[in-house]
């Protein structure tokens, strides 16, 4: 019951514009409880910064595309929109050799940038899913990164197959989610990661 009350309060805060509070709490929780060690977290942060720098340095990509990047355990997710398949591929090629990147998931769609309203909806969906995961006693939600882009939810992290299934089910329950993409590294015995 207590977890449901906390989850409801977090949702209410998010709807009132307190996203910075929730994001700060979520980021703080990730640092303390997630499955990556501090070294890997640092590598992932550097991957994200370097990838964003490279995208911004490519003038054509920067001016015509909307691309977001997220790194977890060396896996780099590219999502967003590019006007042509050529630019989609170029973004991947530009970022494939960023130091620390093990694998690139290119989920960029072809088309124009999404609206601010859609971006806001995506942020709300991410907050809602993270809150529901936090309220689930069977899930270590701090080991899962949730990214929502144009109604598609991407789940990244190091989890067991059971936890991955629970997380995907929670994400699918949202009525506005069009698709759920799981990009997990699975732990077979609690420590070993199977890609």
Residue ranges and their predicted role:
Residues 2-3, 9-10, 17-195:
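N-terminal targeting leaders
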């Amino acid at each position: 019951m207590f977890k449901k009350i906390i989850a409801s309060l977090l949702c209410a805060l998010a709807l009132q514009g307190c996203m910075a509070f929730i994001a700060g709490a979520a980021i703080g929780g990730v640092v303390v409880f997630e499955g990556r060690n501090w070294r890997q977290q640092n590598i992932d942060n550097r991957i994200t910064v370097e990838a964003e720098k490279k995208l911004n340095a490519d003038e054509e990509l920067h001016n015509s595309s909307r691309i977001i990047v997220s790194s977890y355990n060396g896996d780099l997710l590219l999502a967003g929109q590019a006007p042509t398949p050529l630019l989609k591929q170029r973004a991947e090629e530009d970022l494939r050799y960023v130091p620390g990147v093990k694998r690139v998931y290119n989920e960029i769609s072809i088309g124009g940038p999404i609206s601010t309203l859609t971006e806001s909806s995506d942020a709300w969906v991410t907050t809602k899913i993270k809150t529901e995961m936090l309220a689930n006693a069977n899930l270590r939600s701090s080991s899962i990164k949730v990214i929502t882009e144009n109604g598609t939810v991407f789940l990244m992290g190091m989890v067991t197959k059971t936890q991955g299934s629970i997380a995907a089910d929670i994400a699918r329950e949202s009525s506005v989610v069009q698709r759920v993409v799981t990009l997990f590294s699975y732990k077979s015995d609690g420590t070993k990661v199977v890609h």
